[in-house]
Amino acid sequence: MSADEVMTQAAQLITRGDYAGAMTVFDGYIDSNPDDPAGYHGWAEAALFDIQENGNLDEKGKDRINEGQIAAYFRRAAGMAPDNADYNAAYAGALVEFDRIPMAVRQLHKLVEIGKASDEVDVSFHLYEAARGLIDAIDLKTNFDRSTPIARQYISEAVTFAILGLGFSSVEEAIEYLNMDA
């Protein structure tokens, strides 16, 4: 089966909610194509969809899917294709999802650099979505107390990502627009 056929088969399984089936398809693809980041990324995406839809705890209170493996597969895909904005954004998103805020912020800075390095790669959508997720995660972690040290440290980062996600080249550029006389 070609890579496109495998991806189509896995996508169809995901659409039907058969995340475990998609993960199995990606496992087979990874075994035969260990140097292709698409397999690792696809497996991690399917696993994350499963957790988001079904939760990750079984009847005994144990993780059904190893979150560390999900993060590792996202990291591997991003590392194998360091200029791929989608892979890097997905890795950052998973880090936010798994409450790894400092690591997520570092990954988002890499995403900013990917956007700066190429006029053909638009990372604004990824940054805006990540900023929203980051603020949500910080609020949950701090019980909506933005005076805590972690909130004070990372809310400004999230706001910066949001501003860049709106298409401004910098916070300073956005401030110039805010200070313009109407």
Regions found by a protein language model. Give the residues of each.
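Canonical positions in the second alpha-helix
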Residues: 29, 76-77, 111, 158
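Alpha-helical segment of the N-proximal tetratricopeptide repeat
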Residues: 2-32, 53-56
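Short coil/turn connectors between adjacent alpha-helices in alpha-solenoid helical repeat scaffolds
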Residues: 48-67, 96-104, 136-151
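"A position-specific structural signal for the A-helix of alpha-solenoid helical repeats
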Residues: 8, 42, 90, 126-129, ...
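Short coil turns that delineate tetratricopeptide repeat
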Residues: 34, 82, 116, 163-167
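Residue-level recognition of tetratricopeptide repeat
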Residues: 11, 45, 52, 93, ...
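TPR alpha-solenoid repeat register
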Residues: 39, 87, 120-123
